[in-house]
Amino acid sequence: MENLLSVKDLSKQQILDLLALAKAVKANPAEYSQALAGKSIVTIYEKPSLRTRVTFDIGIHKLGGHAVYLDAQNGAIGERETVKDFAANISRWADAIVARVVSHKTLEGLVEHGSVPVVNSLCDLYHPCQALADFLTISEHYEDVSKVKLAYVGEGNNVTHSLMLTGAILGAEVTAVCPRGSSPDAQIVKQAMALAEISGGKINVTDNLDAIVDYDVIYGDTWVSMGDDTPLAQVKEKYMPYQINKALLMRTGIKHVLHCQPAHRELEITSEVMDGEHSLIFDQAENRMHAQNAVLLTLLK
């Protein structure tokens, strides 16, 4: 593994190795406290962030490394200078680049013109670190992730794409339940289905919640993306039937709940569920750090 732009670039064994390493780092942090000693990692944020920034900054520190934060003003890639020059300069100083960007093309440019590993911490198409944290969380409750049935409910987006691709590679069953007109990208769904054929997994896209009866895990995400100015009344009209609430859990028999956050309580998920016995949401948030640490350790070993 030279970079992490999308989980589709990883093999099943590479994903399992990352999950195993994440568990090891989580269980024995002292053993890895100097694993990145002398390493400097530039973290770039074109979009606002809480979990991504904090988990990378603290995670790098816990591994003995040094994180340098660049926001959209100081790291305006392609505006103050070209992606080519940006990548070439950063590569002379830093040991790796972690980038949360608007466009996947920016990440491809950083890889093409830089000479250090690049980690996608979110773009328009994928959110690989999130998906690794999600399956790390699932693996803490299910011994064989290939037998897990995971339902994503809401708008098809970068998180949906990465969940489908990761599940497909691992041999799991992943169903995206989205309102009509809000399905995940058709080309990425096709890629996930092809990967599932190889692994024995299954990928489904539907607008029918009856399709996820007897599933193991349900996953929610915000209905309103950053910068989306759609009136709330319109959003609620379209998505309220897909709210993750106690009634839906009882109807489907689903045991565990995930949400990548930020969560809009009483919209895509109720407080009763988010704070209830079925929720793994804050374990999932913690696991962002451990999964990302495993990625950095693998890239910089």
From Swiss-Prot:
What's the protein called, per UniProt? Answer: Ornithine carbamoyltransferase
Q: Which GO terms describe its biological process?
A: arginine biosynthetic process via ornithine; citrulline biosynthetic process; L-arginine biosynthetic process
What lineage, starting at the top, does this entry show?
Bacteria, Pseudomonadati, Pseudomonadota, Gammaproteobacteria, Vibrionales
| Cellular component GO terms, alphabetical | cytoplasm
Which pathway, metabolic or otherwise, does it act in? Amino-acid biosynthesis; L-arginine biosynthesis; L-arginine from L-ornithine and carbamoyl phosphate: step 1/3
The similarity comment for this entry is:
Belongs to the aspartate/ornithine carbamoyltransferase superfamily. OTCase family.
Mention one GO molecular function. Answer: amino acid binding
Q: Which InterPro entries match?
A: Asp/Orn_carbamoyltranf_P-bd, Asp/Orn_carbamoylTrfase, Asp/Orn_carbamoylTrfase_sf, Asp_carbamoyltransf_Asp/Orn-bd, Orn/put_carbamltrans, OTCase_ArgI
Binding-site positions, carbamoyl phosphate: 100, 127-130, 260, 288
Q: Species name for this entry?
A: Vibrio sp. (strain 2693)
